[in-house]
């Protein structure tokens, strides 16, 4: 299985005020592959990631998953559930009144897991990141790095087929950033997901299978 991006164009505005943000983007990401998107501010990275996640519609072009358009004409997932696409953002966005384990189990239950299944999955993921002793604490009791690790595991809670990460390490120091990317890569490889991450940090490029460079809405050679 693969995610195939075919000639994606995105324009904002109309007429004289029209801005062309993406100008014919083509690439493919295989199952189990971890790809980094890089480019200067305004190059179109976040717009592209947002389109891939179904949060924004393209002006033209197609995104295919398993040889099927990822979204139908009403822009709903056609071959995937929404839960099959996991998002990781720069900020953790944890719910302040939920305990750490509840941040994950709630996601699992909303996706159809039983309470027992959700709890078992959440505990295992939190063990993977060394937070098994923090299950019952609240976000304000966590460090910034711990919050981000919880947010990352939350994105993996439903075993999504596609992971999209937008600058997940931007607020972390070099050591924590490395650990976070190693964690993301490990999950993608072990679960054979499709992973795409935006980052400006060239020190992290070595963890990717490929780096795709964007410039002025186009992929550079």
From Swiss-Prot:
Entry's Gene Ontology molecular function annotations: ATP binding; ATP hydrolysis activity; transmembrane transporter activity
GO CC annotation, single: plasma membrane
Entry's localization field: Cell membrane
EC number from the UniProt entry: 7.6.2.-
Membrane topology: Peripheral membrane protein
Keyword field: ATP-binding, Cell membrane, Membrane, Nucleotide-binding, Translocase, Transport
SMART domains, per the entry: AAA (SM00382)
UniProt entry tagged with the keyword Protein biosynthesis: no
Domain (ABC transporter): residue spans on this chain: 3-221
Alphabetized Pfam families for the sequence: ABC_tran
Binding site for ATP: 39-46
Family the UniProt entry places it in: Belongs to the ABC transporter superfamily. HrtA family.
Oligomer status and interactors: The complex is composed of two ATP-binding proteins (HrtA), two transmembrane proteins (HrtB) and a solute-binding protein.
Free-text function comment from the UniProt entry: Part of the ABC transporter complex hrt involved in hemin import. Responsible for energy coupling to the transport system.
Protein name: Putative hemin import ATP-binding protein HrtA
Organism for this UniProt entry: Staphylococcus aureus (strain bovine RF122 / ET3-1)
């Amino acid at each position: 299985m693969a995610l195939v991006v075919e000639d994606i164009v995105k324009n904002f505005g109309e007429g004289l005020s029209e801005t062309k943000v993406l100008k014919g983007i083509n690439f493919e990401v295989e199952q189990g592959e971890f790809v980094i998107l890089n480019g200067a501010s305004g190059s179109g990275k976040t717009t592209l990631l947002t389109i891939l996640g179904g949060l924004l519609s393209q002006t033209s072009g197609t995104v295919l998953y398993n040889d099927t358009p990822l979204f139908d004409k009403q822009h709903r997932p056609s071959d995937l559930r929404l839960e099959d696409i996991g998002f990781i953002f720069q900020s953790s966005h944890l719910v302040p009144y939920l305990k750490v384990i509840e941040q994950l189990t709630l996601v699992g239950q909303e996706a159809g897991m039983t309470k027992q299944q959700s709890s078992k999955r959440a505990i295992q993921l939190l063990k993977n990141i060394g937070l098994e002793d923090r299950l019952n604490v609240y976000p304000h009791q966590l460090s910034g790095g711990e919050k981000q690790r919880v947010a990352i595991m939350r994105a993996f809670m439903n075993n999504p087929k596609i992971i999209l990460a937008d600058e997940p390490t931007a607020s972390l120091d070099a050591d924590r950033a490395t650990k976070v990317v190693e964690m993301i890569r490990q999950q993608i490889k072990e679960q054979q997901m499709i992973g795409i991450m935006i980052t400006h940090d060239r020190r992290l490029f070595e963890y990717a299978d490929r780096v795709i460079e964007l410039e002025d809405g186009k992929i550079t050679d």
